[in-house]
Structure formats: structure tokens, C-alpha cells
Amino acid sequence: MAETAVINHKKRKNSPRIVQSNDLTEAAYSLSRDQKRMLYLFVDQIRKSDGTLQEHDGICEIHVAKYAEIFGLTSAEASKDIRQALKSFAGKEVVFYRPEEDAGDEKGYESFPWFIKRAHSPSRGLYSVHINPYLIPFFIGLQNRFTQFRLSETKEITNPYAMRLYESLCQYRKPDGSGIVSLKIDWIIERYQLPQSYQRMPDFRRRFLQVCVNEINSRTPMRLSYIEKKKGRQTTHIVFSFRDITSMTTG
């Protein structure tokens, strides 16, 4: 039986609101759980500076003590997680597909490294990064096309693919916390950068779909179900339906 998440609604309400452009939600990239956690904190820092600004210097900091407090770690564990995750950002890029630039089967895209600098100050107990300035517009000055959720909604998720799926669902979440969205399997594999073996439906179902749905149901305030949509004998889409546990208990 899946573990049921214990949701503290007051803490959830007071938790930082993570807001990012839908372009970033739909982008192709692969990050670890700890890298995703840091990205959430960076997004929060950038938007707290002034959500109306069109420019930001891109310099963000992570205090070891604060990170440890947020994610329930010791200082040593937090410092190790931060150090390893930041180091592993090297060589990783985020890809934004540009359909208007497509030519035949060849896709148009823009690809960016996440950071242009990272630093560590042991004497102050903090790490800092300089986010690629080309990425700043995806975090600030957002008008209509954005995805939002509370940090507390995702902090217990351990699977980075479940984090990506949760963001995709939140992109289509209604004000009452419910939603239905159909995602193409090929799109999920491409944008979440899943292993090539997941193109086989049994592997996709067992290693991605079931694992992520179970984790979201047990570790977030979302209650999620799905059906597989077929074209002939081939499964092509996954249709997700979800509700927020708050609406389920108060509605």
C-alpha cells in the first residue's frame, strides 16, 4: 500500500511559490533531484528580487544551513548534496525547441548552459551561482504563460522524473486544483530526456509511469490517475486526471 503524504496546509500556504515560464516547463533537460531542488530555490530568489523586473544579474546563493532546514538534512549532508549537484551541472544544457525553425524532420532549437559561474565560500557557509543571463527571462516578467506551485508540494519527491511530471501537470492545473491533460509519450521521452530504453512501452510503464504516479500520489497534495490512449495497437498518449487533496477534503 502506498504511503499517504501528510500535508500541512498552513505550511504549504506559507511555502515559497515557484513560478516559471511554460517554455521552461516544456523544455528538454535532465537534472537530478538535488539539482531540481536548487533550481526551485534559484527561481524563488530571482522572483523575490522584484517580479516585475525585466533584468536580473543572475547571481543566486544557497546557504547550507537554510538548505538543510528546508529539506531536513544535517549541515554535512546539505553541503555534500549542494557541492555534488552544482559540480554536475557542468556540461548540462536546457533545450528550447522552436517549431517555427523546423525543416522537414530536423527540429529547430536553442540550447543554453544553466550557469556561467559557480563559487563556494566555506567561511560563510554558502554556495553561489551566476545563472546564464539568457535564461533570466524565463523566471521573471511573466504575464500569461507560466507554471506555478509551492515548494512544499515538491520537496518530498525523490524522483527527478516525477518532479518534471508534476510541473507539467501544474501547468494545466485549474484554480480548484483539478485538471486533465493528455501528454504524448514521445514528447515526454524527449522533454524529460528519458533513457532510450523507455521507448519500449513495458519499460516506460514500469520504470517511469507507474513509479512517478505512485510517488506523486504518496508525496504531494495531488491525487493522480491516468489512462493510456492508443492508436491502433500502439499506446501514443497518457491522459492524466488529477485533483488537489485540499479540494477532496473540503469540497
Swiss-Prot record:
Q: Which Pfam families match?
A: Rep3_C, Rep3_N
Q: Which domain of life is it from?
A: Bacteria
Q: How does it assemble?
A: Monomer and homodimer.
Q: Which UniProt keywords apply?
A: DNA replication, DNA-binding, Plasmid, Plasmid copy control
Question: Which GO terms of type biological process are on file?
Answer: DNA replication initiation; plasmid maintenance
Name used for this protein in its record: Replication initiation protein
- Any idea which residues the entry calls the DNA-binding region? 75-83, 200-207
Alphabetized GO MF terms: DNA binding; DNA-directed DNA polymerase activity
Question: Quick one: where's region Dimerization?
Answer: 1-144
Q: Where are the transmembrane segments?
A: none
Cross-referenced InterPro entries:
Initiator_Rep_WH1, WH-like_DNA-bd_sf, WH_DNA-bd_sf
Task: Report the sequence similarity comment from the record.
Answer: Belongs to the initiator RepB protein family.
- Name the encoding gene, please: repE
Cited function = Replication initiator in the monomeric form, and autogenous repressor in the dimeric form.
